Amino acid sequence: MFYPWSFSRVCTGELCVLRDDLGLLTDLDAQLLAISVDSKYVQRVFAEREGFTFPLLADFWPHGEVARRYGIFDGVAGVALRGTFIVDREGVLRWSIVRGIPDARDAQQYRDVLATLD
């Protein structure tokens, strides 16, 4: 899942909900990867401070390149939009949602979609 900024209110809230429900995601055989344009050093401190045990990836340099490839880089703000992509074991995109920078996603949607995939 892409998120705009580490340590921001909405991003931290979204990731903390997923942290607290991580057991449910792993029970559904899902792996969570979270990515923003923050540096790996920021990501490390953010993960330690919030107790995240899932990987936080840094799309730092070239700046936003991964987000650009997914078509969700906001060139004006210089960050990724809130994009979530569920990819199956074969690398096939099964579901996605993209929200604006200020708009939090509903984690229940992830649970519902993952429960329907084989």
Predicted regions and their residues:
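Chalcogenol-based redox active-site neighborhoods
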Residues: 1-118
